[in-house]
Amino acid sequence: MSTTETEHIFRYTHEFSDTIIASAAGAVIRDREGREILDFTSGQMSSILGHAHPEIVATVRDGIERLDHVHSSFLSDPVIEFSRALSDLLPDKLSRVLPLSTGGESNEAALKMAKLATGRYEIVAFDRSWHGITGGAGSATFNGARRGYGAPVPGVLALPTPHAYRSPFASNGDYDWRAELDWGFEMVDRQTTGSL
């Protein structure tokens, strides 16, 4: 990959791979040279259903041919039907839907709703988490991808992620998850300003 290929693209997580992907089908992606690579990383839709799944392609094609986008102040039949079908599967108290496009966008909305409902601003996130790249969701993401973007949103507290494989709370082959969890919540108690 040359610098001319990336000169107009911001990175938002780690540095780009030198491999340029040209196509994908099922669980396989192909680079420009035709090399096939098993894809275990491209996200929930591709991982579970595969790239270019024929039924999904047909459904998307059909939907785009009729209506591809409207302003958020308008409703469309697919949005109404989806919202009704989803709410029918949920408990009565969860009868309203907020359709969003990405996981980061969904996490951002969830953070705002939690803050609105509680009147507080602190949240707790696992220290090995990925929640997205938007302001709040990115602040609750704890990995190398958050470097270089300045200060995160205030009030995000880190809870150590349980780690049985290499836990500092393992001795003689025994994993003391309760001690690890207690220590983690003690760390949260030390970080909070009382707005949790």
Where are these regions (language model features)?
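Electropositive phosphate-/nucleotide-binding environments in soluble metabolic enzymes
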Residues: 19-23, 50, 54, 73-76, ...
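Short, ordered coil/turn segments that flank beta-strands lining enzyme active or ligand-binding pockets
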Residues: 32-33, 166
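PLP-dependent aspartate aminotransferase-fold enzymes
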Residues: 85-195
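Sequence-level motif detector for i,i+2 pairs with an aromatic at +2
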Residues: 24, 35, 153-156
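Glycine-rich loop-to-alpha-helix module at the N-terminal edge of alpha/beta enzyme cores
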Residues: 9-10, 36-124
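Short loop/turn microsegments at loop-to-beta-strand junctions
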Residues: 17-18, 24-26, 33, 44, ...
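Short beta-strand-to-turn element immediately C-terminal to the catalytic PLP-Schiff-base lysine
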Residues: 30-31, 49-51, 139-141
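Active-site-adjacent loop/helix segments that line or gate small-molecule/cofactor pockets in enzymes
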Residues: 1-28, 64
